[in-house]
A protein has these predicted regions:
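Extracellular and select intracellular beta-sandwich modules with Ser/Thr-enriched
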Residues: 417-419, 431-437, 511, 524-531
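Short, composition-biased motifs enriched in small/polar/acidic residues
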Residues: 536-615
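Proline-centered linker/hinge motifs at extracellular inter-domain junctions
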Residues: 347-351, 445-449, 489, 496
């Protein structure tokens, strides 16, 4: 079959060089992709089921390579080839354009690493298209006139590459309804940042807020229309692809930290915003379609290779690490903006209700959100971006049949802003759709919290110490006061420690105790700790006497052996006439029997003893 390539031109009729920054907005001209003449591939495009996920399909002389996938993700590496076949002439400059021949080193390897990362994570494969021919021979990110010039064999390589892209796009569309195509490149700019291209010009990138026209002409217009975020946030907000990669340690532009390329010495820093592939296959309003396209221009250090002097094994590890983090970032990106999981297995994924952002007070509940299931057999669940604020137990689902609902209950005393509440719905055929909203939990001033405290039972005379220390969620300093309690007790005003030693007179009674903790400052909240302390009844001691150290003529001593209750003081009193009593001493035994010795007993013809309890 014969085909006529149609090139995008500028107003002067000259073929546009897509390696240069995109000029001010211009009318979009559709590019009709010519099918190359190999009958096997031409037939294959109408028989998509002949491509087995995970299998590799080759173009002529293995110049192009298609690894079929079963995910809504397409990866291409048009400039990663290093084959230098003599049958293909080197491309040359013309009067209308200057060719770029530098390859994007290691991008083919990086594309394979991304495929491996997907396989490791999901057991599934992205669609991968690689041009194995050196860029000096063919450029598959330019229109065919510049990319293949006038050589028939070179044009075949170019056509094969783009036919494989269309096969992958059709596979994704047929299977999932929508998806993402990433055109993988490598830049040599001195600033080591990944450059994420959405077909926005340099002047666009310096805008504070993108316009509707910018959105309509971007390569992710369909995704932007689906996302609950503004186009500006989709491009460089906290959930943009650049920011998701950056939080994993890979600086990117645009992102929250680098919303535009920046300026050095009065000159805008170099930034590749997209090329022929993003303009041709992106979902601009003019192009239509549902396969959004992003160009990623990877920096060299710690992305495509460890360094210019590192070993091959070190470089392999670096690429594997970046690929793993890119896949993790894309997993989030799909859920936030494409409303599907990256490992969804059906077309189209079930739709989840759109939710409004919610703001509640700490320790409260959200209002009820309706969830309409496509089928009563579908399953649904939720997760949050911050389990410290909303954990799995905080998702309370209700309803029945296809009419379900959700209430979210944050953890006690937890608060924070912009917590992402994600809801999933999975169909029986494996399709998984998503939607989400921001939950803000505003803090409230909580009263101090005392730890739980059991009632106490003690003997009279036992010193009771209770560290009744309260905590304050907001970290306010606390003061303590005794609200009520038995005579003789006290509370430390700074530490809240309660102390008391009950007297004998207080035995046999249960005493309520109340301690108040109050936040410092005017209007501080307070809490009260209540508990009871029971003082056992005092029991009379048992006493026996004995003589030691000889007879009365050799200064004998009297020993008093006592058994009784631990806690009280034991006061030994003596008298010679049972009228006048005097205290011989006081002891607080820690064990029984307890022995008291009267060393002066032999001085008296008779002596009486009495044991009294105190205090």
């Amino acid at each position: 079959m014969s085909t006529i390539p149609i090139s995008r031109t500028n107003s002067g009729g000259k073929v546009k060089g897509f390696w240069t920054p995109i000029p001010p907005k211009f009318p979009r001209i559709f590019f009709l992709l010519p099918l190359f003449c190999l009958s096997s591939l031409a037939v294959a495009q109408t028989n998509l089921s002949s491509y087995t996920p995970g299998s590799t399909y080759w173009g002529r002389n293995n110049y192009t390579e298609y690894i079929a996938g079963n995910m809504p993700l397409i990866i291409s590496a048009p400039h990663g080839g290093d084959d230098y076949p003599s049958e293909l002439p080197n491309r040359t400059n013309t009067s209308t354009y200057t060719v770029t021949t530098d390859p994007d080193l290691w991008t083919a390897n990086l594309a394979r690493a991304i495929r491996t990362a997907c396989s490791n994570r999901y057991g599934r494969y992205p669609h991968v298209i690689i041009c194995n021919v050196h860029r000096a021979k063919v450029d598959c990110n330019r229109e065919i006139v510049e990319g293949a010039q006038n050589n028939t064999n070179t044009q075949t390589v170019w056509k094969e590459f783009h036919a494989y892209i269309n096969i992958a796009r059709q596979q994704v569309t047929n299977t999932y309804g929508r998806g993402l195509y990433i055109d993988l490149h490598g830049h040599g700019h001195p600033i080591q940042k990944n450059e994420i291209g959405y077909d926005l010009s340099d002047s666009d990138m310096f805008k504070t807020t993108f316009s509707t026209t910018d959105d309509n002409e971007s390569s992710i217009h369909a995704l932007s229309e689906r996302s609950r975020q503004s186009f500006t946030d989709v491009v460089r907000g906290e959930l943009s692809l650049g920011s998701l990669l950056e939080k994993r340690g890979y600086p990117c532009v645009p992102s929250v930290s680098s919303p535009n390329p920046g300026v050095s010495n009065g000159v805008t820093n170099a930034y590749f915003n997209g090329g022929y592939n993003t303009q041709t296959y992106g979902t601009s309003l003019a192009n239509g379609g549902t396969i959004d396209t992003i160009q990623i221009e990877c920096n060299y250090t710690n992305v495509r290779a460890k360094s210019s002097t590192s070993s091959y094994s070190e470089d392999v590890a670096v690429r594997a690490n970046f690929a793993s983090n890119l896949v993790a970032s894309l997993e989030e990106y799909f859920k936030y903006h494409l409303e599907m999981t990256m490992d969804t297995q059906a077309t189209p994924p079930p739709s989840v209700n759109s939710f409004s952002d919610k703001t509640i007070l700490e320790d409260g509940f959200t209002s009820t959100s309706s969830i309409n299931l496509a089928s009563a057999s579908n399953t649904f669940w939720g997760e949050s971006s911050d389990p410290n604020i909303v954990d799995a137990s905080g998702f309370i689902f209700g309803g029945s049949g296809t009419s379900r609902n959700l209430v979210v209950r944050p953890r006690a005393n937890a608060y924070g802003s912009n917590v992402i509440v994600m809801v999933y719905q999975q169909a029986t055929n494996g399709g998984v759709g998503t939607d989400w909203y921001y939950l803000t939990v505003d803090p409230v001033n909580d009263a101090p919290i005392f730890p739980s405290l059991s009632n106490r039972t003690i003997n009279p005379g036992v010193s009771l110490t209770i560290p009744a220390i309260a905590t304050d969620v907001e970290g306010a300093s606390l003061g303590y006061a005794l609200v009520s309690g038995p005579a003789g007790c006290s509370v430390n005003p700074s530490t809240g420690t309660f102390t008391w030693r009950p007297t004998i007179a207080q035995s046999g009674v249960t005493y309520p105790v109340a301690i108040r903790a109050t936040e410092s400052g005017t209007g501080g909240l307070s809490s009260t700790l209540n508990f009871q302390t029971t003082v056992n009844s005092a029991t009379a001691p048992q006493v026996s006497t004995s003589w030691i150290s000889g007879d009365a003529q050799s200064s004998p001593q009297v020993q008093l052996s006592m058994n009784g209750q631990l806690g009280p003081d034991y006061l030994v009193w003596a008298s010679e006439d049972l009228v006048n009593w005097f205290n011989l001493g006081t002891a607080t035994p820690t064990t029984f029997p307890f022995v008291w010795t009267d060393a002066n007993a032999s001085q008296y013809p008779k002596r009486f003893y009495q044991i009294r309890l105190g205090p």
